[in-house]
Amino acid sequence: MLSPKKTRFRKQHRGRMKGISSRGNYICFGRYALQALEPAWITSRQIEAGRRAMTRNVRRGGKIWVRIFPDKPVTARSTEARMGAGKGDPKYWVAVVKPGRILYEMGGVTKNIARRAISIAASKMPIRTQFIISG
């Protein structure tokens, strides 16, 4: 699973996801990409599941770039815990994704293979996405 090696603070506020993505919304590395159409928190497990699905689908050919990184800790309390006594411990990590953000990129494969692999990865995501081609 992806997670930061070291952070300045252990816990973060939830924040809010307003507007569209102002960065990471152009294809930089590959030729094909998966772009988010809705705002969401995407967990490190979901990112990894999508990456594995794509890798398994393209086999040897092609290269895959993961363009998001989970850098926000999500805390949780145990189910039996009473109210109060502070914020819970970090449980998992999420990437904050806004509409327009590129999630994955792919290159070195044909359009059909890329579309199939990216659609499988898209099914692992908790949001609506679209397949885009650079150029």
UniProtKB/Swiss-Prot annotation:
Gene Ontology BP term (one):
mitochondrial translation
Tell me the compartments it is located in. Plastid, Chloroplast
Q: Name one Pfam family in it.
A: Ribosomal_L16
Its cellular-component GO annotations read: chloroplast; mitochondrial large ribosomal subunit
Record key words, sorted = Chloroplast, Plastid, Ribonucleoprotein, Ribosomal protein
- Gene Ontology molecular functions: rRNA binding; structural constituent of ribosome
Coiled-coil spans are none
Against HAMAP family, the record matches this protein to: Ribosomal_uL16 (MF_01342)
How this chain assembles, per its entry, is: Part of the 50S ribosomal subunit.
Q: Which NCBIfam families match?
A: rplP_bact
> Which family does the similarity line name?
Belongs to the universal ribosomal protein uL16 family.
Give the protein name, as stated in the record.
Large ribosomal subunit protein uL16c
- Where does this protein come from, organism-wise? Jasminum nudiflorum
